[in-house]
Amino acid sequence: MYNFSVPDICDEFSDIQIGDLFLNSYGSKNKFFGQIHTAKCEHSNSIVKEFVNEQGEGKVLLIEHTGSELCSMVGDQIAQKAYENKWNGILTNGCIRDVEIIQNIDIGSVSYTHLRAHETQF
């Protein structure tokens, strides 16, 4: 694993964009990087499932969640599948669940936390 710090990267690349500071790290990898692949989701994580079922070596999945904060985009099964297919990490402005399990999966996972599955209807 490469050693790097966010301030050093910002110093070297002045046009870099930094994510929200209130996102939390949940996977066992606190630092991860790779080619970004973006999934835009509203109320279903079906496209996320499609992405993590593909080979992900050297890649990071960025989930742009435009829907309600009352549902999750990532759970333990998706995180496990991403790990099995060698994704470096998952970053989302949406919510995840099963954080107690995800923290033991060797993958980077940065997001908000939520307890409900995406299928929950209100």
What is each model feature region?
Residues 1-35:
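Intrinsically disordered, low-complexity regions enriched in acidic/Ser/Thr/Pro/Gln residues
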Residues 45-51:
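Surface-exposed ligand/attachment interfaces on beta-rich extracellular proteins
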Residues 114-122:
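Single conserved hydrophobic/aromatic residue that forms the stacking wall/gate
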Residues 67-68, 95-99, 115:
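Acidic, glycine-rich active-site loops and adjacent beta-strand->loop/helix elements
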Residues 35-41:
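Short amphipathic
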Residues 51-81, 85-93:
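Extracellular/luminal Protease-associated
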Residues 103-115:
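Short, hydrophobic/π-rich interface segment
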Residues 28-32, 52-56, 83-84, 101-103:
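Solvent-exposed alpha-helices and their adjacent loops that cap or buttress functional pockets
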